Amino acid sequence: YYADVYNNIATNNTGGILVFDLPNLPKQGGKFVRVFNNKSFNNNTSNFAPEGNIVGEVPSGTGLVIMANSHVEVFNNEFSDNSTIHIAVVSGDLESGDENYYPHPKSIQIHNNSYSNVGYAPDIERGDLSKLLVEIADGEMPDVIWDGVLPLSQALLGQPSDEKLILNESSSIKFLNLDALWYFLFSYFHSPNRDKTDFSGDIIALPEVKEW
């Protein structure tokens, strides 16, 4: 809730920076988080968390994971030498059984970051995300991914414009919408979606977090 994450060096971790919301906890609904002026690099340490644990699903070589949070702004960060992915925007546990848990990230804005050297040794040993990424990317690993998982109503009728992922980055960055829901339902007809224009839009800067 209402956090500024800035001026950090994240290195030699499994995942450099994690912005998570988890089910079955007394405090949920993470929102209004700014991640800026950080350096996240060489986060290629093997994941030693117990399998079955949410954190245990994070692949080695990840710069930043945004999971099941809303209103997150990521800007002016440097991502480099992460062997799987620089930024992953993904849904949380879809089968948690927690009626109060909303697993889908929404209103995420990513802009004015720098990226270099990614995806050169993706971790396919932990969790499903990296395995799915490698299969769908087919050798062309991206800097930023969105898993493309939406509530069924939005998958059919469209996502509200104020909840869409906004990606305002250099034209040289590589992006991939995994479109994972349709991949699992209609894999024969699935093709990688790398079109960044679907995610262009105006940045609405989040307010600075005030000290208590």
Model-derived features with residue positions:
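Short, solvent-exposed loop/turn segments at secondary-structure junctions
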Residues: A88, E95-G97
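Short, recurring structural edge motifs at helix starts
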Residues: D21-P26, G61-L64, D98-E99
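Short consensus segments that form the blades of beta-propeller domains
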Residues: P26-G29, I54, D98-H104
